[in-house]
Amino acid sequence: MVLISKRTLLRASAAAAAWGAAGAARAQEIPPHERALHEAARREGELTWYTGQYNAETSEAVGRAFTERYPGVRVNVVRSTSQVAFQRLSQDNRAGVPQCDVFASTDFGHYSLLKRENRLLQYRPENDAQLIPALRGSDPDGYYHTSFMGLYLMAYNTTKVSEAEAPKKWTDVLEPRWRDQLAVGHPGFSGAVGIWAVQMRKMYGWDYFTRLERNRPQIGRSSMDPVTGLNAGERSVGIAVPSATTLLSAQRGNPLRIIYPEEGVLATLSPQAIPRNAPHPNAAKLFMEYTATTAFSTVIRTLFNDPINPAVDPPPGSRPMSEVKLIYPTQAEAERGVPEVRELWRDTFGI
């Protein structure tokens, strides 16, 4: 996972205005380089996308939209947490039966490892130039490219907690009054939760999690699992939840409200890559091109995800980036820290 600064996102917002209506028109066009890839991809007929980035509903919507834009190429969506996606990819490799054409994880360490082991196909999407400027060229060598931008914060069930009572800071959830009322994902499964744990340890030390454990949080797998628990009324406050999933759930009538912690919101970027042994490499290349287009960002925005193409406005209900304080570990801190916090988490929470 790559981290992004507030200054970068503000520049992106300014760039969006410059694209204007012309960008929307371009979304309906298929340029020559995509048409050539489409012809080759049609002969392959399909691609398989291992993804731990967008939720299942968004991922399926992306798959359908891709096939509508490029008829004759089906997307097999395999949605899981990022760690499970990586385990599945590794198992395929050990078995000598490649299944994955595009691998998308929220754990940046996966890409560093795969690149070192020469397990990625080098490909530089021409459409990468359409991305928010700061998102271009994730890897100077061209082995992986940005496909996801997310904000992780807190949320609460409005039927169980009033606005006045709701936590305002990441540290507020450590108060004893929140015992048996909290929900959080697991860094052993979710790359985003792993990054959040690294950042909390950086800010407060591991004592933050020792104190959190005393409040007996409900621990799921994905960063999205707490939202399900809040909707069901099982818990009152979700920690390190994605803004997109929470806003979408609230828009559908669930009693949820997001919290922008005073210390800052975790801001992250994640890339995707083509395995070197991908069975449908042309379809995979076409998919890499697609995820940089306005067409892709338009689809994900309808489900409240943050667009990565500057021609598409942010989702409704989210704060302007100028009003959001962002926090994040460095890439080096994240790569080194995620494996460490996984082990510490198991020792502390016993799971």
Sequence positions of predicted segments:
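A bilobed periplasmic-binding-protein/Venus flytrap-type ligand-binding module shared by bacterial periplasmic
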Residues: 153-160, 197-198, 268-280, 299-300
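Periplasmic-binding protein-like
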Residues: 150, 178-188, 210-213, 219-220, 252-278, 290-314, ...
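Short, polar/charged alpha-helical segment
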Residues: 31-42, 47-48, 52-72, 154
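A ligand-binding cleft/hinge motif common to bilobed small-molecule-binding domains
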Residues: 109-113, 236-255
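Extracytoplasmic ligand-binding site segments that recognize negatively charged/polar headgroups
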Residues: 50-63, 75-90, 98-234
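Short beta-strand->loop
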Residues: 120-129, 142-145, 171, 248-266, ...
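N-terminal export signals
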Residues: 2, 8-27
